[in-house]
Amino acid sequence: ETLAIINENKGASKKSARILVDMLAAYEARRALRAQQRISNHRVQATQKVANFQTYFIDLVHDKEVRGVSRRLIMAIFYGFSLIYEQLVNLKLTMYRWGWVKKEQLDCFVISLGNVTVGGTGKTPTAQHLARAIHEMGYRVAILNRGYRAKWRGDVGIVSDGRALKMDAETAGDEAFMLAKHLPNVPVLIGPKRAVTGRYAIEHFGAEVAILDDGYQHWQLERDMDILLVDAVNVFGNGYLLPRGTLREPLSHIDRADVCLMTKVDQAAPGAIPYIWETFRSYNQDGLIIESIHQPRQFVRLSHWYEDIGAGGIPATEMEGKKVLAVSAIGNPASFEQTLTDLGVEMVESMRYPDHHDYGERDMAEVLYRAETLGVEAIVITEKDAVKVPGDVVRAKWRVPIYVISVEVTFQKGREAFFRTLKEQLAAKLGNGRHMPQEADVV
């Protein structure tokens, strides 16, 4: 993702990314994943695999104390390139703001969801929550995703028509597939140009509202509402721009946001939430600020999770007291493990794979062997892991059941003001929702 962002700014920035990959190759090769870690009173087994470029890049730039001459040199070079990157980003934005490069418009209400940092902030579950809410207001809504890591190539790809899935996770990409899985009645489209996929959604699905998933930097398209997500656990990364840090653009650019949505506020460190409020207000006096949390909703059998849109499972509370093996390949496994602990699950052990790891049949055989050895009642994985499990494994008869934990976003502080504003703006542009009762309850 980091390289993809830099690649959008052609020339010097693209060349810089190639140089950085070469420089980090030796560094990555020498690093090994930590073998054993412990959280609370649970044993944690970390697999002995080499993590990918993005994992080590994040580890490197977030080190608070840069040790050694070589690492200091790398950081100095990164900082130099980050200054170049900042100028390119500012130039590109200026060209759009002054009209030197024309923005395209869609004949519908456009909402952009995104962030100013590389990495996850909860865009996918937030897009799901927002799409459901708008649909319940009576508007036809579609989600436009760029198709990150998708094998599909073309102008417009239909992941879901709102009734059935049209692509698998490998073809559509993880994010788009997960969106489609949870959104009956909401088409999900992928394609590099949101104006193209947006027009298709309007013409073929009658879309009245288009949600741009990860669209904060997609300046090519006009939008009616810009929603900026900020992870309350990892606030603005380390404060530096790419490649010295994880900022996609300067913090001053949060002045574009109409809404600041803080995610995972229940897991935030002391002082993090006031800091986000203060930082946002220093650049943006008028935007709404909302706080949200991620809540576990249900556990779905892996085979059922793959079946079709909106697969059902058991309530999250029913897993309380059960002995489970947690398995994950995500950036923050401790958060996933803490969620299980908070639910009252007896997590006997947790197997951590590198972030974005693609599970092979050998990996899953190791997981099953470990589960049987420990005598657990279930294996629990995240939805991001579920899309990486091979199809043969999904269809196989497992002696220990595999469950996928499904998480949803819940808006808290600022919720009423946000939905009141959203309803007013939708009604002003589109009129009242026509397809369902106007006073539908918004969760």
Where are these regions (language model features)?
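A transmembrane-helix-recognition feature enriched in membrane-embedded lipid enzymes
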Residues: 49-108
